[in-house]
Regions:
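Surface-exposed patches in mature extracellular/periplasmic domains of secreted proteins
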Residues: 103-115, 218-226
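Surface-exposed short loop/turn segments
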Residues: 103, 111-172, 246-279
Length: 279
């Protein structure tokens, strides 16, 4: 009898968990832009949270030793976003790509030849609702002050998202890897920030990790176990100098001040100074 009651009690809990999970992420389309040299031969591949279509040529990627990064562009039409916010998101993509690719490749300056040339384009940004984000921040901080000791999920409304397409071409402009990628914020792992590009900014590093892994390993980045971050990645994420001077063009990560700002839901512009050189 007790077991039967427990089963009956668990059913609404399971239904609630399922409902929360379904509402935990915002859905972001996977648009195809016009910035890639080719969209042929791309196959669907889906991670736990991201949607993607990709094409990868393993042999030339694994043989490559140097890479050059072309600054990320935006191709989202009349969006209503502040140009400074868009530039910050684009630069965050570049900075993360530069750091992640440094694990195996030597990143060279724009004026130097490279085995691979990487460029990305932001094709869509789903705006973060600042009012909803502020409510989530207040609820989270209130729980901390009350000493509940339990993380409070974000409100499942007004979540933002990001869509990007990117490719790596060789010296002859022949495409060796390409990816269409999109991902929405979720109520568990994406911290609310009171900025229309708050979630897009946070998700920029997730895209960079997926795309870089494809180039580093020469295969679908969504298959297999995620790698442990290298020491140079950790150092750069904490605001340290990057491994290669070419990455200094994208500025340094906000580090600990940025983490504190994210905890309090402050806009990324408060702590991220953006590119070190004009784009």
């Amino acid at each position: 009898m007790i077991l039967k009651l427990r089963r009956l009690e668990m059913r609404p809990r399971a239904a609630l968990c399922a409902a929360l999970w379904l509402s935990a992420c915002t859905s972001v389309p996977l648009p195809q832009g016009t910035s890639l040299s080719s969209y042929a031969g791309m196959s669907p591949s889906t991670g736990i949270l991201a949607k993607a279509r990709l094409r990868v040529d393993p042999a030339p990627l694994l043989a490559a030793q140097t890479v050059r990064i072309v600054p990320t562009a935006t191709q989202i039409g009349s969006s209503g976003f502040d140009p400074k916010d868009l530039a910050l998101v684009a630069n965050a993509v570049d900075r993360a790509l530069c750091t992640d690719l440094s694990d195996r490749f030597q990143v060279v300056a724009p004026s130097l030849p490279a085995d691979l040339i990487v460029h990305a384009t932001v094709t869509d940004i789903v705006a973060t609702n600042r009012t909803a984000a502020a409510g989530s921040v207040v609820a989270s901080l209130g729980a901390s002050v009350a000493g509940l000791g339990v993380p409070v999920p974000r409100l499942p409304i007004g979540l933002g998202g990001l869509a990007i397409e990117a490719e790596a071409v060789d010296k002859d402009s022949s495409q060796k890897a390409a990816m269409l990628w999109s991902r929405g914020a979720n109520i568990i792992t994406t911290k609310a920030r009171v900025s229309t590009v708050g979630d897009a900014y946070s998700l920029s590093s997730a895209f960079a990790a997926d795309f870089s892994r494809m180039l580093l390993k020469g295969k679908d980045p969504f298959k297999g176990m995620p790698a442990i971050p290298s020491m140079q990645r950790l150092r750069a994420s904490l605001g340290g100098d990057p491994k290669y001077d070419a990455c200094k063009a994208f500025g340094t990560a906000p580090g600990l001040p940025g983490m504190v700002a994210a905890r309090f839901g402050l806009p990324p512009t408060w702590t991220d100074k953006g590119a070190a050189v004009s784009r």
